[in-house]
């Protein structure tokens, strides 16, 4: 699923990316817990992807992957370097590099893994 997320960032496919989210999706970021609707998530990521060119979205370390005993829940902890060019209205871009660590919680719904929660930090 991490490979698909990377693909959707580079291809700017907000629809496919947010289709990975469960109906109960939670986002924990910048000291806040949010439960955005799928449509709100789509609109936010669509706008973000349209204004961003991803140059690098790579692991600094191998992801840590764990599963619940019954196999219905999993989590993946990642440490990534992300390099982007933020595009502005005049066609020029501003380069930005960030190191992110995040935890993605996956839950199985009708034999399909969905993203239930993402907790993200960056330095």
PLM regions with names:
Residues 97-123:
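Short beta-strand edge/turn micro-motifs at domain boundaries
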Residues 36, 75, 83-86, 123:
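A short local loop/turn or secondary-structure capping micro-motif enriched for an aromatic residue
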Residues 8, 28-29, 85:
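Short, solvent-exposed loop/turn elements at domain surfaces
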Residues 21, 80-82, 119-121:
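Short beta-strand segments enriched in hydrophobic/aromatic residues
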């Amino acid at each position: 699923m991490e490979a698909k997320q990377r693909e959707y960032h580079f291809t700017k496919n907000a629809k496919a990316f947010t289709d990975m989210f469960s109906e109960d999706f939670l986002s924990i970021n910048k000291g806040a817990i949010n439960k955005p609707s799928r449509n709100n998530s789509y609109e936010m990521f669509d706008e973000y992807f349209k204004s961003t060119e991803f140059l690098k979205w790579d692991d600094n370390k191998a992801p840590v992957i764990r599963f619940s005993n019954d196999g219905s829940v999993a989590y993946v902890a990642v440490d990534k370097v992300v390099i982007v060019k933020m595009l502005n209205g005049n066609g020029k871009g501003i380069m930005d590099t960030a190191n992110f660590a995040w935890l993605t919680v996956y839950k199985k719904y009708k034999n399909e893994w969905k993203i239930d929660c993402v907790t993200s930090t960056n330095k």
